[in-house]
Structure formats: C-alpha cells, structure tokens
C-alpha cells in the first residue's frame, strides 16, 4: 500500500530529528538549525497538508462502513485534527531553542521525542489496526481511489518526487543534514 511508503518517508524525518537531537544531547554537537527548519517544514507541507487529508478521505471514510471500525476511525481522525497543533507546539519549542540557546534545548529535545513517539504510535495504529480492516472491507473502487489519490502526492522523500518545490526541499534536507541522515557537514 502506497500509504506505507509515505509513512516510511515521515518515519525517516522523525528518526533524523531524533538523531540530531541525540547528537546534541550526547556529544554537545552543533547542528545547523536550517536542517531542523527544513524538517519541520516537511512535516507541515507534506503529512499535515497532503497525507492526512487524503488518509481521511480515502482510508478512513470508507472504513466507516465497518461498524467495528467506527471507534478506531474516530480516534485516527481526532489525531489527524490535533496533528497541526502538535506540530505548532514543536515549532514553538524550536523557536525558543533558537532564540534562547542551550538553556532551551532540553525542552526542545523533549518535544521532539514526544512528537516522534506520538507520531509513531499513530502510524502504528493505522498500519496494524486500520490497514487490516481495509484489506477485509475495501472493494475494488476503494483501492482504485487510493491508488489514484496517493501516487500523485508531492512527497519529497518518496520514490516519486514529482514537484520542483518538493524536490528542492528534499535536496535541502539531504544537503544540510549530516551523515548518516544526509550529505551535509559533520556535526561538531
């Protein structure tokens, strides 16, 4: 399912953010703030504005036909609705870290950990609970709608990077992030 591929892209960004936070925690490394900015922008531009609305329409809406899935669908829709606020909170912690320096890092690092943990739990819920239900209850029309809706997305980290803006964002993340995340300068 193409949604899994998009989840892997989101997962890569979350792991990248945690890796950088852990480099700062354990090595007191200096990380170019632009890489965090690009990652936060990605999380807003793709998952929040493209991926989740399409999941709501093409995955969760058809799942409502199964009475046993209604509570799960409501829970996932609520998480999607709250996702933007969670991202805004993370962005605020990042801004405070940028403005306040090292004394604000612990709160930012904790916010990254919490955001990633909640996001991973959300994706796990979709993949382990919603997808199996979809495999049982979706008809050919439902699958066709998913196939047509998702490959056209502009996910810069997925195999099909089909818009110039998203290609630029992917390149920016890859060029700013140090190895093993990208090809940017080593953290100091």
State the predicted function of each range.
Residues 1-188:
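Small-residue-biased structural context
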